[in-house]
Regions:
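Conserved acidic, metal-coordinating active-site core of Asp-based
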Residues: 97-174
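Residue immediately C-terminal to the conserved phosphorylatable aspartate in receiver
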Residues: 2
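Active-site phosphate-binding/coordination module
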Residues: 10-117
């Protein structure tokens, strides 16, 4: 795992971990990252440690080197159903993650910036996309336009709908 295991809260990998990884590989062990993050959210300094593979997006994708072993995508219908649900229930802060990027709502962008996070700069800039700026072809839907393996949402302290209701209402797709 990366967060809180391989790297600290500032995404710094200690020298002891770097040494341990190198020693394990020198002794013939294969090293894999297993993370909830999508690959575009893994910092270059972590990937540069030379892992043999990555299990990412909470197990929805697996790669060995540059070879994709499998990838589970959220169906276009599920994305569209969730987006309609978010709109209906005034859920403004959500994101979708996949191998080609992170797609975020304006509410999620505000959330990141309120935490001092720079979402569209540095090594990750090309992977971040505001959902409102996605060019959805005529006759298509967002669900058919983006390819993602994971989504999440955040509500305020008094949401219009409970987590349990959301879980129940979106159960046909998730």
């Amino acid at each position: 795992d990366i967060d809180g295991a391989l790297a600290d809260e500032n995404h710094i990998v200690p020298e002891s971990a770097k040494t341990a990884c190198a020693r394990a590989q020198a002794n013939g062990h294969k090293l894999f990252i297993c993370t909830g993050r999508s690959v575009p959210k893994i910092e270059r300094n972590i990937l540069d440690l030379g892992f043999d593979g990555v299990v990412s997006v909470a197990g929805a994708q697996a790669n060995i080197g540059d070879k994709l072993l499998f990838q589970h995508l959220v169906s276009p219908e599920a994305i569209d159903a969730a987006m309609a649900y978010f709109a209906e229930h005034h859920i403004e802060s959500y994101q979708w993650q996949g191998a080609d990027g992170m797609y975020i709502s304006e509410g999620y962008r505000r959330h990141l910036e309120s935490k001092g996070k720079t979402w569209n700069r540095g090594e990750f800039a090309r992977f971040w996309h505001l959902l409102d700026e996605i060019d959805v072809p005529a006759g298509s839907t967002l669900g058919h336009t983006i390819h993602v393996s994971k989504g999440s949402y955040f509500t305020g302290p008094e949401p219009d709908v409970s987590f349990e209701d959301t879980q129940h209402d979106l159960a046909p797709w998730f």
